[in-house]
């Protein structure tokens, strides 16, 4: 579930499809209507794009639905929308999270790699390669810093698969800083004062 930046809409996945509902009125709109499933919704900063993971043709990808008409302000009352693939075709990708400044989308690629891509398009930037593996939905977590310059995530450093640490990743350089190095599994991180 995701709340739009202006607080006027809530996006959610119900029975595998994306819906958006108004917080002010009793209006709900179905965004997707496919035999495959969707999950993990995230609004853009301006609320005009909705990102989500969707299974299409047997492959998970990050998709977005865009408000195409200038006069449309909300998904619940939009006259037209357009769905498009955001991640690379043929690469398993899911769990999109839009940065607070609206410039980036972070997501998991191939179940092992944390990547970012600019919302305007362009190349995908790998931030954390292949050490982690996502066995089930939501078992890999990451969060944007309030200034959109860093990501916090759990990762496997020197301790192997049974010892996760908390990493601070600088998006611009890709520098990974292990914040915990405790010798024990660490998790449940949060940004403070954001």
Regions flagged by a language model, labelled:
Residues 78-84:
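A short helix->beta-strand "capping" segment at the edge of beta-propeller domains
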Residues 170-194:
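Repeat-solenoid scaffold signature
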């Amino acid at each position: 579930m995701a709340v739009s930046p202006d607080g006027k809409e809530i996006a959610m996945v119900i029975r595998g499809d994306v819906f958006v509902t108004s917080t002010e009125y009793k209006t709900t709109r179905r965004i997707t209507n496919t035999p495959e499933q969707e999950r993990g919704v995230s609004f853009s900063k301006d609320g005009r794009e909705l990102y989500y993971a969707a299974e299409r043709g047997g492959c998970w990808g990050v998709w977005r639905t865009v408000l195409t008409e200038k006069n449309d302000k909300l998904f619940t009352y939009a006259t037209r929308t357009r769905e498009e693939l955001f991640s690379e075709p043929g690469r398993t990708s899911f769990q999109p999270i839009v940065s607070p400044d609206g410039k980036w989308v972070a997501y998991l690629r191939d179940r092992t790699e944390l990547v970012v891509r600019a919302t305007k398009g362009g190349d995908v930037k790998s931030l954390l390669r292949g050490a982690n593996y996502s066995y089930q939905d939501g078992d890999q977590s990451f969060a944007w810093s309030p200034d959109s310059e860093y990501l916090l995530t759990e990762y496997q450093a020197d301790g192997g698969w049974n010892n996760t640490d908390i990493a601070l990743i600088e998006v611009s350089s890709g520098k990974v800083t292990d914040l915990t190095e405790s010798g024990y599994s660490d998790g449940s991180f949060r940004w403070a004062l954001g």
